[in-house]
């Protein structure tokens, strides 16, 4: 089996890919410009990508290809009509980043809601130490409890963010981008 990694740069430097050697011959490219994809995948049975487009232009000569494995959750870079019509399966790593993205959402929200950039600068500038008052409320901030939290898309990440928002006392509303999700827990 021929396994081709087209962009190991997207995996980071701390990932050991040696186990793939047990499955067949493995070729690893740190990065692949789109114009080099057809040549690099022409003999592949499995192609592992992150963001590189997989479509008729890049896959036309890949007559042995059986699987495109995406090292991400999104697969919008794969022309599914083309791969399906050629018997090429697609797989992703759904769910690998759900907690990280939900957590990052709240990190950014707290950064903005609590004016952390302003107060970080205020303390580091020394102004806090020279202030005659103990408290400084130049920039107002508030709590989440009782606020309305809107979510666009109620997939795995949206549901996780909604759950955390409810734990903070928020009223959660959402818009389903696909029209498929009619989650009764939220408006």
Task: Identify the role of each PLM range.
Residues 1-44:
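N-terminal glycine-/charge-rich "phosphate-binding" loop or analogous flexible N-terminal tail
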Residues 30, 71-72, 88-99, 176:
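Short beta->alpha connector loops at strand-helix junctions that form conserved
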Residues 40-41, 59-62, 144:
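A short, aliphatic-rich alpha-helical micro-motif
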Residues 76-88:
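Rossmann-fold NAD(P)-binding glycine/threonine-rich loop
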Residues 86-88, 94-148:
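Phosphate-binding beta-alpha-beta segment of Rossmann-like dinucleotide-binding domains, i.e.
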Residues 135-187:
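Rossmann-like dinucleotide/phosphate-binding beta-alpha-beta segment
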């Amino acid at each position: 089996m021929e396994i081709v990694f087209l962009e190991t740069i997207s995996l980071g430097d701390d990932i050991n890919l040696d186990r793939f050697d047990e499955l067949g011959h493995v070729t690893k490219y740190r990065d692949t410009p789109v114009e080099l994809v057809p040549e690099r995948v022409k003999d592949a049975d499995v192609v592992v990508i992150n963001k590189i487009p997989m479509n008729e232009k890049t896959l036309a000569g890949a007559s042995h290809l059986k699987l495109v494995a995406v090292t991400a959750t999104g697969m919008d870079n794969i022309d599914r009509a083309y791969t399906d019509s050629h018997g090429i399966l697609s797989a992703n790593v759904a769910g690998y980043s759900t907690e990280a993205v939900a957590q990052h959402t709240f990190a950014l929200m707290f950064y903005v809601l609590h004016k952390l950039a302003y107060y970080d600068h205020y303390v580091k500038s020394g102004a806090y130490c020279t202030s005659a008052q103990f408290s400084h409320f130049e920039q107002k901030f508030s709590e989440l409890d009782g606020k309305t939290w809107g979510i666009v898309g109620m997939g795995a990440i949206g549901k996780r963010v909604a759950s955390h928002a409810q734990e903070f006392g928020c009223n959660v509303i959402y818009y389903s981008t696909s029209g498929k999700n009619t989650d009764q827990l939220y408006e």
